[in-house]
């Protein structure tokens, strides 16, 4: 997946929601308590990390965005620890202090990288406190481009309909990480990011991909939303927007150690990318990559811009999905175009791959984000080149092409020209090597009629499959 990171420092984001402190007690365990059948943990490390909506804000700051944070806290030492934690990492906190409630704290006891127990210290905040918080946050809308409502059902978000309407009226995008079975509270928001269980709690059990899309489209209409991004664990995530094909983004996680805060990372990366000017499909791809990084960490964590860049390099260094059928490629191209990727296509026999081919394909790939190579099958090559050709079977030719870093997809065709397959795939740019005239290139007219372009590239002089074959024969 080709993803370009925007200038995150341009993003101005306000996070409103349930802030909390994630406290970790860590130590070894080597025996069972004589008082009860439970392990004894000898604590030798205590660590506090901002969690919930505060973790969302920290993720934005880690990516380089400017972030303000509004939340409800108690008048206690935990609130002081939370303040120190967010300020140290560049987040501007705006607390509303509720004197008769504690600051929400999640205490986790860990040993050998395993969580043994979690202890929650919390009391739900009432509607009066929530309304006061949303009114306070509303005064900050002129200073931001994106708002995140981070709802953990602890009372901070409450009934946000008026706040959402005010933000949208000012042109501010409102992203919601929802909670509970009543998404109607978020009516009019720009986008919701439920996980699969949260989504099914609202719409019912999803029985298929088509059913997911149908239910999502109905929810979009019922709640007047611009989009839904359903996060699906090992299946990645699915973006649904009105009157457009769904966009499936596969997971990029290599190893999963801890899913704590993964949803926070998704919505924070999404908001930062949108605030920096990224289009929605690109922003979702960025969020998906960020989530793949954070689940490889233990505990509540953030993802830095450098980590995101390295993850994208690693992921995009793969040579795509290789040899595909036409039907597979049609679907892949729909997804690529939804992501805003520029697709380049070329074709040929590529019987004996040589330096000229490699140079030509690298030039072609440099003109876009994705490169398709359509390859004549064996019968087609034989008709074009004569008996004794091809030297290599179509399967071998395609396997070698798919191994090149410049090539994303390789697809065979059986006709003498690729006109039919080009007309079906309709790339953004069709390229051909040699001294062709644009008007003589097979499939060129169809590409141009679809708004695409056709370009002729030069071949490397003195290098050809025919010359290589003749050279081999002359030596033997």
Curated annotation (Swiss-Prot):
GO terms for biological process: ADP-L-glycero-beta-D-manno-heptose biosynthetic process. ATP binds at residues 195-198. The active site is at residue 264. This is Bifunctional protein HldE. The keyword Nucleus does not apply. Keywords: ATP-binding, Carbohydrate metabolism, Kinase, Multifunctional enzyme, Nucleotide-binding, Nucleotidyltransferase, Transferase. Pathway: Nucleotide-sugar biosynthesis; ADP-L-glycero-beta-D-manno-heptose biosynthesis; ADP-L-glycero-beta-D-manno-heptose from D-glycero-beta-D-manno-heptose 7-phosphate: step 1/4; Nucleotide-sugar biosynthesis; ADP-L-glycero-beta-D-manno-heptose biosynthesis; ADP-L-glycero-beta-D-manno-heptose from D-glycero-beta-D-manno-heptose 7-phosphate: step 3/4. It catalyses: D-glycero-beta-D-manno-heptose 7-phosphate + ATP = D-glycero-beta-D-manno-heptose 1,7-bisphosphate + ADP + H(+); D-glycero-beta-D-manno-heptose 1-phosphate + ATP + H(+) = ADP-D-glycero-beta-D-manno-heptose + diphosphate. HAMAP family: HldE (MF_01603). It comes from Shewanella amazonensis (strain ATCC BAA-1098 / SB2B). Homodimer. It comes from the Bacteria. Catalyzes the ADP transfer from ATP to D-glycero-beta-D-manno-heptose 1-phosphate, yielding ADP-D-glycero-beta-D-manno-heptose. Residues 345-476 are annotated as: Cytidylyltransferase. GO terms for cellular component: cytosol. GO terms for molecular function: ATP binding; heptose 7-phosphate kinase activity; heptose-1-phosphate adenylyltransferase activity; phosphotransferase activity, alcohol group as acceptor. In the N-terminal section; belongs to the carbohydrate kinase PfkB family. In the C-terminal section; belongs to the cytidylyltransferase family. Transmembrane segments: none annotated. PANTHER family: BIFUNCTIONAL PROTEIN HLDE (PTHR46969:SF1). Its EC number is 2.7.1.167, 2.7.7.70. Residues 1-319 are annotated as: Ribokinase.
């Amino acid at each position: 997946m080709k993803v370009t990171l925007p200038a995150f420092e341009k993003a101005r984001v306000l996070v409103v929601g349930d802030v909390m402190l994630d406290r970790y007690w860590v130590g070894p365990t080597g025996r069972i308590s004589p008082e009860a059948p439970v392990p004894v943990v000898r604590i030798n490390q205590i660590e506090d990390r901002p969690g919930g909506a505060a973790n969302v804000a920290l993720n934005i700051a880690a990516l380089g965005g400017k972030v303000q944070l509004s939340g409800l806290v108690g008048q206690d030492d935990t609130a002081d620890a939370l303040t120190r934690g967010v300020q140290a990492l560049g987040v501007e906190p705006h607390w509303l202090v509720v004197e008769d409630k504690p600051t929400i704290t999640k205490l986790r006891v860990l040993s050998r990288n395993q969580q043994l127990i979690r202890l929650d210290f919390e009391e739900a905040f009432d509607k009066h406190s929530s309304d006061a918080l949303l009114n306070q946050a509303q005064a900050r809308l002129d200073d931001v481009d994106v708002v995140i409502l981070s709802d953990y059902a602890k009372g901070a978000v409450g009934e946000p309909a008026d706040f959402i309407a005010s933000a949208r009226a000012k042109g501010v995008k409102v992203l919601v990480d929802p909670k509970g079975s009543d998404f109607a509270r978020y009516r009019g928001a720009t986008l919701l990011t439920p996980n699969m269980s949260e989504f099914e709690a609202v719409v019912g059990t999803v029985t298929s991909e088509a059913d997911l899309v149908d239910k999502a489209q109905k929810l979009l209409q019922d709640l007047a939303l611009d989009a839904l991004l359903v996060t699906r664990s090992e299946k990645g995530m699915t973006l649904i927007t009105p009157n457009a094909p769904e966009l499936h983004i596969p997971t990029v996680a290599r190893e999963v150690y801890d899913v704590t805060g993964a949803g926070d990372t998704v919505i924070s990366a999404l908001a930062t990318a949108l605030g920096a000017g990224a289009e929605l499909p690109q922003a979702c791809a960025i969020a998906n990559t960020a989530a793949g990084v954070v689940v490889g960490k233990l505990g509540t964590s953030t993802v830095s811009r450098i980590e995101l860049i390295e993850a994208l390099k690693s992921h995009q260094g793969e040579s795509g999905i290789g040899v595909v059928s036409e039907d597979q490629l049609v679907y892949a191209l729909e997804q690529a175009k939804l992501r805003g990727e520029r697709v380049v296509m070329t074709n040929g026999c590529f019987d004996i791959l040589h330096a000229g081919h490699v140079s030509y394909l690298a030039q072609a790939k440099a003109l876009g984000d994705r490169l398709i190579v359509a390859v004549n099958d064996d019968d087609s090559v034989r008709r074009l080149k004569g008996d004794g050709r091809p030297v290599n079977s179509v399967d071998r030719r395609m396997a070698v092409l798919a191994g090149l870093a410049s090539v994303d997809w390789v697809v065979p065709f059986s006709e003498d020209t690729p006109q039919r397959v080009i007309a079906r795939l309709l790339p953004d740019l069709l390229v051909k090597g040699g001294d062709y005239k644009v008007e003589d290139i097979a499939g060129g007219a169809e590409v141009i009629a679809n708004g695409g372009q056709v370009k002729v590239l030069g071949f490397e002089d003195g290098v050809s499959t025919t010359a290589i074959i003749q050279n081999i024969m002359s030596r033997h």
